[in-house]
């Protein structure tokens, strides 16, 4: 369980350390959301590609990717079944409708995960902003104190 810290009681170096920690946490959460969005986009594209699988496209010629920049000609033979990469080199054969349902579930799951992370990211941003404001206040206090001491010495 996280403990509560009163940032007004922290000195400038401690505030700097806290700010750096919050920077790292914000970066981690932002990266996590970005990675989830990349995977979600992949699933959305895969689901959308299933729309070309209909009887009118059966037998049509297409380009089959061997790499991201190399293709070979092919024909669309079976428009009712697809192989889905389920990870770690495993593929599962599904009907086009089952594949759409599979991708929809994956997209929904990723959306929920991003929705769980978003509030934490916003909270960390707000905490970082509060720390930065407190740092600014402390710097202003130190500057004013230094100016007052310089005036007294003069």
Swiss-Prot record:
GO terms for molecular function: amyloid-beta binding; unfolded protein binding. It comes from the Eukaryota. It is found in: Nucleus. This is Prefoldin subunit 5. The gene is Pfdn5. The modification N-acetylalanine is found at residue 2. Belongs to the prefoldin subunit alpha family. PANTHER family: PREFOLDIN SUBUNIT 5. The modification N6-acetyllysine is found at residue 42. Heterohexamer of two PFD-alpha type and four PFD-beta type subunits. The modification Phosphoserine is found at residue 56. GO terms for cellular component: cytosol; intermediate filament cytoskeleton; nucleus; prefoldin complex. Binds specifically to cytosolic chaperonin (c-CPN) and transfers target proteins to it. Binds to nascent polypeptide chain and promotes folding in an environment in which there are many competing pathways for nonnative proteins. Represses the transcriptional activity of MYC. Keywords: Acetylation, Chaperone, Nucleus, Phosphoprotein. One of its GO terms (biological process) is negative regulation of amyloid fibril formation. It comes from Mus musculus. Gene3D superfamilies: 1.10.287.370. Pfam families: Prefoldin. NCBIfam families: prefoldin subunit alpha. SUPFAM superfamilies: Prefoldin.
